[in-house]
């Protein structure tokens, strides 16, 4: 199992960190940094919906963890001037759980369902008419006396978030009028996010210090903010409280986060593939067993950034490390790698192996 306190994981952390995350989240599209295409499109859609005094179309937001799906959902509600009710797929175990939330929505409210790909089929069936016709079909009674009744719902916007859009059923996916994919952030945008967060937290940070944190944050705002808080601790105890490039570098080296944003678990994954599987190809289940992790942890937490940076490829035969992985560890590149495809030639769908 992955360490819940792993510094550079993009999954949720400790309660204290989550409270600070909420404190530094942007509340409007004007404050939302990065994702320029998504921001421009959502600004247009929201302005149009408000002009018609209608609920915004149902919106699906997907992408790797930590890129701001929850933040964007809250911004949508804020920009629409409505309330937001938040829940998650695993929490909605029975149709009655969903019905209780839907019947308490006000007109044009936002219902945010995180991890929407984990909805049970029976709950998903109830959601279809609610999304399409704003009606709720519920069963009253049991056995021969059971009957179905329809309840009218006020117009609302469902915002679904998922890290695994491919696991959504086609009927559910087709009911979203707006689909947005969040991409990993570039270093410039992450530097701006770090500087903004530092200002909110009352920290003194130099641009070079913000850049140093940003370049090791794996393209993920949540990780950037978490690193900022740990560098703050280092600067407070072993420095003068000011975050410079040198301070950030020393702090992150102490925390075992290297210049590429890799920690010991990333390096363990890559070295396992190189040393135990000769660089691959290796199936994800075999890899999970070798490093004592769960399959979904590799697919959702460890792999995405390594693939995006070109250190791992998904091929029809399994996962394969690239030249970059050998160079990262100062290892000799096998001669056979001259015959291998370049990173990115194979599509992600190729390896559920």
UniProtKB/Swiss-Prot annotation:
Return the SMART domains for the record. Answer: AAA (SM00382)
Q: Does the keyword Hydrolase apply?
A: yes
GO annotation terms (biological process): DNA recombination; DNA repair
**Has keyword Cytoplasm?**
yes
Q: Which domain of life is it from?
A: Bacteria
Q: Where does DNA bind?
A: 295, 314, 319
The alphabetized UniProt keywords are: ATP-binding, Cytoplasm, DNA damage, DNA recombination, DNA repair, DNA-binding, Hydrolase, Nucleotide-binding
What cellular-component terms does GO give this entry? cytoplasm; Holliday junction resolvase complex
Q: What main location does UniProt list?
A: cytoplasm
One GO term in the molecular function aspect is:
four-way junction helicase activity
Which of this chain's residues are annotated to bind Mg(2+)? 70
Instruction: Please give the Pfam families that the UniProt record associates with this protein.
Output: AAA_lid_4, RuvB_C, RuvB_N
Q: Where is this region: Large ATPase domain (RuvB-L)?
A: 4-185
**Spans annotated as Small ATPAse domain (RuvB-S):** 186-256
Could you tell me the EC number(s) of this protein? Answer: 3.6.4.-
Instruction: List residues binding ATP.
Output: 24-25, 66, 69-71, 132-134, 175, 185, 222
Q: Which reaction does it catalyse?
A: ATP + H2O = ADP + phosphate + H(+)
Where is it located? Cytoplasm
Domain comment from the record reads as follows:
Has 3 domains, the large (RuvB-L) and small ATPase (RuvB-S) domains and the C-terminal head (RuvB-H) domain. The head domain binds DNA, while the ATPase domains jointly bind ATP, ADP or are empty depending on the state of the subunit in the translocation cycle. During a single DNA translocation step the structure of each domain remains the same, but their relative positions change.
What NCBIfam families is this protein classified in? PRK00080.1, ruvB
Subunit: Homohexamer. Forms an RuvA(8)-RuvB(12)-Holliday junction (HJ) complex. HJ DNA is sandwiched between 2 RuvA tetramers; dsDNA enters through RuvA and exits via RuvB. An RuvB hexamer assembles on each DNA strand where it exits the tetramer. Each RuvB hexamer is contacted by two RuvA subunits (via domain III) on 2 adjacent RuvB subunits; this complex drives branch migration. In the full resolvosome a probable DNA-RuvA(4)-RuvB(12)-RuvC(2) complex forms which resolves the HJ.
Similarity annotation: Belongs to the RuvB family.
Summarizing the function annotation, the protein's role is: The RuvA-RuvB-RuvC complex processes Holliday junction (HJ) DNA during genetic recombination and DNA repair, while the RuvA-RuvB complex plays an important role in the rescue of blocked DNA replication forks via replication fork reversal (RFR). RuvA specifically binds to HJ cruciform DNA, conferring on it an open structure. The RuvB hexamer acts as an ATP-dependent pump, pulling dsDNA into and through the RuvAB complex. RuvB forms 2 homohexamers on either side of HJ DNA bound by 1 or 2 RuvA tetramers; 4 subunits per hexamer contact DNA at a time.
Q: What is this protein called?
A: Holliday junction branch migration complex subunit RuvB
- Species source reads Pseudomonas syringae pv. tomato (strain ATCC BAA-871 / DC3000)
The root-end lineage is: Bacteria, Pseudomonadati, Pseudomonadota, Gammaproteobacteria, Pseudomonadales
